[in-house]
Each structure stands twice: as structure tokens, then as C-alpha cells.
Amino acid sequence: MMTCPSVPAIPTLWLFSILLLVVSLNAQNKSWDNPICTEGILSVPRGNPAVMTCNISNTFTDVTIQLSANGKDKTIFDKKPQGNFSWRGWELQVQGGQAQLVIKDTQDDHTGIYLWQLHGRQRCYKNITLNILEPSNEDKVPDTTLFTSFPDHAKSSPIEGKPGTLVGVITVIFILGVAGFITFIYYRHRRS
């Protein structure tokens, strides 16, 4: 009668542990977008510029902006990639992980809720409400450049924007420790 040699359990468990480690570390290399946008309600005097921004920690794939006002939804920019775009008084600049919507001369038809659909590594939705106020004489701003320079992401900390990294590393170490402990117990049990 012929018997097949059995596959030792220890190398199998170690291979499984290494595979688990590789998969876990690969998952940790993908950072979340962590969107930061103009918050809540933006109130601007009629005729003045309005600037709304959304920034993510990764590069934008595309940006869609819709305006909801008076019970109607209107798409202003649909799935715009990197670049500068203009349409009926709205200007959109998408550069890296930063998007900026500028209205140079705000009017009543600009009032409403702006739904930002951000697409980087994930999809995220943000609402910004724009209210138009009656201007006073001192509210009028002289015409200046509205686009601000964007900060360089290369100078920011590599840990910034990745709060889950430490939790992921601790989880991987814990799983490997448990796998090692189970392997040790199994090995001792088989030898006794």
C-alpha cells in the first residue's frame, strides 16, 4: 500500500501568514481621499465673487457640480477632469487633489445648494449652500485674481491624511502574532 507524504502544517500556516501580510500591507498603501470642502453656508453680497473649494488627499479623477434651486436641479459641470472650465459665469479649476469653483459676479440665479460629486480613489458627495445678500457700498471688492496658488503636496507629511495606517499596522502585527501562536501550539501538539 502506497501512502502520500503529508504536507507539513507549519510551512502551510507560514505561507498563509505571509500571504495575509502582503494583502494587508497592499491595502494600507491605498490612502483615503479625506475631502475637505467649504463648509455649510456661504453668504456673498450680490455682484461680489464667490469661491467654493474642495480638496482631497489624492488626485481627482473627475468632478461633477450640480446646483439645486427652486425645486430644480441643474448640472453645471459634469465629470470634468484636470483643467480649467467655464460655463455661464461659473469657472471650475481642477488641479491635482484641489478643485475650486469661482463665480466672479454673483447674481440671484447662482443661489442654491451646490452638490459636489468628488471622484478620487473613492466617490464622495458634499453640499455647499450659496446665499446672495444685498450689497452695501463697502462690500464691493476691486477686481483681483480669484484663483489662489495651491500648496505643494510634496512638502506635506507622508503620514498626513492617513489616520488608518497605524491601526492597519497594529492589526497586521496582531494577526501575525495570533497565527504564529496557533502554529506554535499546533507544532507542539503534533510533536507530543
Curated annotation (Swiss-Prot):
Regions that span the bilayer: 166-186
Residue stretches in coiled coil: none
Glycosylation sites (chain numbering): N29, N55, N84, N127
GO MF term (any one): cytokine activity
Gene Ontology CC annotation, any one: plasma membrane
Localization per Swiss-Prot or TrEMBL: Cell membrane; Secreted
Residue spans, topological domain Cytoplasmic: 187-192
GO biological process: immune response
Extracellular side: 28-165
Annotated protein name in UniProt: Secreted and transmembrane protein 1A
Organism of derivation: Mus musculus
